Amino acid sequence: MATIRWPAPAKLNLFLNVNGRRPDGYHELQTLFIFLDHGDWLEFEPLPDTDQLTLSPAIPGVPDEQNLIIRAARLLQARLPSPQGAHIRLEKLLPMGGGIGGGSSDAATTLVALNHLWQAGLGEDELAELGVQLGADVPVFVRGRAAFAEGVGERLQPVELPGAWYLVLKPDCHVATAAVFQDPDLPRATPKMAFHNLLEGEWKNDCELLVKKRYPEVANALGWLLEYAPSRMTGTGACVFAQFEDEKAAREVLAKVPKRWDGFVAKGENISPLFVTLQQISDWDIAKR
């Protein structure tokens, strides 16, 4: 059987409002997630009768106990009736510290793929509950649908957004999410609004001004991109993005991007490429019976 390549797609926060800080230190948010048809790729080779997990290539500076891929697999292993292991191969295309969900998406793909390959039998809700232990963004990747998120990101309302193309730039810096949310200068008082009102209003990112102040390269990239199209930062950065009606317009601007920044063009997707892959595999399995 041919090895299956499982996608771990990027996401964008089309807006991000910080509504307040909870007593436990987490923040109340309202945000809108959409997936992109661009991301990392993972391959999984199941290893029966062992709990061994290996990842290649290793991510420099990230030990196994901190790696979200290994941590996701360990969480799933704990739900199995008998030992199962895996050798995992990662093709890393998404930047770390970029605000486009690279680590969270890898974790979600690991949960979804190994749940299938190990025949663990966990449902979507159970996988999402495991995912939230790894990060607030993991459940949206597990569920695989563009969504309006509230709370700390755990309350998800699926949405259907118009098709669009995006140009994403990665400034040459790494933004730590925890540092942004711990910063005393972060705005934390945006009033909560109903989703339909948010859709009709001006989309913004409450983290953007702070991150631009702390990371001048983000401000430079955003300023450059704003010359061509309305642009915002995604998540807590460092990536910034602009929306276009068609691929041609986005690629014309990509061709002009200064060499000091990495960038890519991708299509927005309401259904995650991971969800599409899982459905295709499930259909193949049914057809073989």
Curated annotation (Swiss-Prot):
The keyword Kinase applies. Keywords: ATP-binding, Isoprene biosynthesis, Kinase, Nucleotide-binding, Transferase. It is an enzyme of class 2 (transferase). The active site is at K11, D137. Gene3D superfamilies: 3.30.230.10, GHMP kinase, C-terminal domain. It comes from Aeromonas salmonicida (strain A449). Catalyzes the phosphorylation of the position 2 hydroxy group of 4-diphosphocytidyl-2C-methyl-D-erythritol. InterPro entries: GHMP_kinase_C_dom, GHMP_kinase_C_sf, GHMP_kinase_N_dom, IspE, Ribosomal_Su5_D2-typ_SF, Ribsml_uS5_D2-typ_fold_subgr. GO terms for biological process: isopentenyl diphosphate biosynthetic process, methylerythritol 4-phosphate pathway; terpenoid biosynthetic process. The lineage of its organism: Bacteria, Pseudomonadati, Pseudomonadota, Gammaproteobacteria, Aeromonadales. ATP binds at P95, M96, G97, G98, G99, I100, G101, G102, G103, S104, S105. Pathway: Isoprenoid biosynthesis; isopentenyl diphosphate biosynthesis via DXP pathway; isopentenyl diphosphate from 1-deoxy-D-xylulose 5-phosphate: step 3/6. It comes from the Bacteria. Belongs to the GHMP kinase family. IspE subfamily. One of its GO terms (molecular function) is 4-(cytidine 5'-diphospho)-2-C-methyl-D-erythritol kinase activity. Pfam families: GHMP_kinases_C (PF08544), GHMP_kinases_N (PF00288). NCBIfam families: ispE, PRK14608.1. This is 4-diphosphocytidyl-2-C-methyl-D-erythritol kinase. SUPFAM superfamilies: GHMP Kinase, C-terminal domain, Ribosomal protein S5 domain 2-like. It catalyses: 4-CDP-2-C-methyl-D-erythritol + ATP = 4-CDP-2-C-methyl-D-erythritol 2-phosphate + ADP + H(+). The keyword ATP-binding applies. Its EC number is 2.7.1.148.
